[in-house]
A protein has these predicted regions:
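Extracellular adhesion/carbohydrate-binding repeat motifs centered on closely spaced tryptophans
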Residues: 1-85
Length: 85
């Protein structure tokens, strides 16, 4: 089979979203930058290029909620895991 790289994917229940970085590793525990080439598994390009995301301790992405960015400003995390611009 093929390893997921640079991909947004859901768990088996379809409730938690994950990002597998270009090295095939799930992001975890904090802020990270999307590569700009990420794909949604089975759907093709996500339509969002780059930007920031936040991964929880279980590797799931923070979605549809407000967080504090590294500089302390409040930001909204969209349903696809990207920080709203």
């Amino acid at each position: 089979g093929y390893m997921y790289v640079d991909t947004l994917t859901y768990d088996k229940t379809g409730t938690k979203l994950y990002y597998v970085n270009p090295y095939g590793v799930l992001e975890r525990n904090g802020w990270f930058q999307f590569s700009g080439h990420e794909f949604e598994a089975g759907l093709g390009f996500s339509g969002k290029a780059g930007g920031y995301g936040y991964a929880n301790s279980d590797c799931s992405l923070s979605v549809n909620e407000t967080r504090r960015f590294t500089d302390g400003t409040k930001v909204y995390m969209q349903g696809d895991g990207h920080m709203a611009q």
